[in-house]
Amino acid sequence: MLRTHYSNEITEELNGKRVKVAGWVQEVKDLGGIKFVWIRDREGIVQITAPKKKVSEEIFKLIPKLNSEDVVVVEGIVNFTPKAKLGFEIIPEKFEILNRTQTPLPLDPTGKVKAELDTRLDNRFIDLRNPKVMAIFKIRSNVFRAIREFFYNEGFIEIHTPKIIATATEGGTELFPIKYFENDAFLAQSPQLYKQIMMATGLDKVFETAPIFRAEEHNTTRHLNEAWSIDAEIAFIENEEEVMDVLENLVVYAINYVREHNERELKILEFELEEPKQPFPRVTYDKALEILSDLGKEIPWGEDIDTEGEKLLGKYMSENEGVELYFIYKYPSEAKPFYIMKYDEKPEICRAFDLEYRGIEISSGGQREHRYEVLLEQIKEKGLNPESFEFYLKAFKYGMPPHGGFGLGAERLIMRMLNIGNIREVILFPRDRKRLIP
């Protein structure tokens, strides 16, 4: 390898030892008889100090010719000294330019010169050199790591379902059509039907992390047309509240994992991530509408709570209950998909729930209808053709246990966790209504 150490691996035990560091030139300072170079790598900054009397003439002449963002590798001796900004410096013995950068740069990777979001996204490879941007994606990586760890610890089995499908998951029109040889097909908007089929196999508890595709024309700070979904399905449940328990514990596990393993990144972002308060409050749909009505926001019974309503409710729960995460459940059946189980004693209400985080829905789930005849009728009630769902319905004919699950939006979870205002900030190459490149 071209480097022996990242910047954060240089400790006092290495004082007087030879190391090799590599990265991008962040800053050069020429004070005549002494020259400085600050090199940035994935983990931080390294100071290279080149006194004329201690380095070769070749290195001394090379340093002033460096440009910001040149890629370099430096071999030298570590010197811990209070005179260095970072507490240590490297006196270079070898200094190699691996690649020159063109100038001017399309944006400033330090973030000192502000750039529009579109400019940043068009040049994402430079944007990520900004420590604050990189911190987001290090946290994202650990969120996915924590999620997998949680599921495996809880006895879940990881599955991978098709992303090219023949029919709509929920009967909607918000699908991206594609040509599949002589057939018409679509990009999957959810693994919903497939993870439910898995409940008839005996696997009992499954999860998947994968992209989903939704042809919604929303162009907002909270919508993407390609996003990552964290899906789970659990067999042999008694009711939807058991699924809510799993989702709550998953989200808490992920947040606390970031708190423990991303202290440096949170410090870079100047953000204090608080431990979630448990248990998450569980607010019925009717109660949510009552709260909103008291706040001057009227929503007709049976309709979804809109963006404004979510924000108002989020503010109310924060100010009055001191919580950022809470469930809304017991929704009107007409507001939820065909596969959600209704209450037998009150069929206008169903066993669905949403998880809200700081006024944004980050997850939906519920107990599913596992009884074949009832499910068939619910498909018809939604105006859908059962023949389009034959592959799915077949699994319900031969022994389908009671089950439930959820889908959790990874980007929404991360943007709310870090209190970031635009969902495009937390995915590398966003796909939205107007962005297809890069």
Curated annotation (Swiss-Prot):
Keywords associated with the record: Aminoacyl-tRNA synthetase, ATP-binding, Cytoplasm, Ligase, Magnesium, Metal-binding, Nucleotide-binding, Protein biosynthesis
UniProt keyword Ligase present: yes
Coiled-coil segments: none
Plastid in keyword set: no
Cofactor stoichiometry and binding remark: Binds 3 Mg(2+) cations per subunit. The strongest magnesium site (Mg1) is bound to the beta- and gamma-phosphates of ATP and four water molecules complete its coordination sphere.
Name of the protein this chain belongs to: Aspartate--tRNA(Asp) ligase
Subunit structure: Homodimer.
Residues reported to bind Mg(2+) 3: 361
GO cellular component terms, A-Z: aminoacyl-tRNA synthetase multienzyme complex; cytosol
Sites where the protein binds L-aspartate: 170, 214, 364, 368
Domain of life: Archaea
InterPro entries referenced in this protein's UniProt entry, alphabetically: Aa-tRNA-synt_II, aa-tRNA-synth_II, aa-tRNA-synth_II/BPL/LPL, Asp-tRNA_synthase_2, Asp/Asn-tRNA-synth_IIb, NA-bd_OB-fold, NA-bd_OB_tRNA
Assigned EC number: 6.1.1.12
Top-level EC class as recorded in UniProt: ligase
Function of the molecule: Catalyzes the attachment of L-aspartate to tRNA(Asp) in a two-step reaction: L-aspartate is first activated by ATP to form Asp-AMP and then transferred to the acceptor end of tRNA(Asp).
Recorded family membership: Belongs to the class-II aminoacyl-tRNA synthetase family. Type 2 subfamily.
BP terms from Gene Ontology: aspartyl-tRNA aminoacylation
GO MF annotation, one: aspartate-tRNA ligase activity
Cofactor(s) the record lists: Mg(2+)
Chain residues that bind ATP: 214-216, 222-224, 361, 409-412
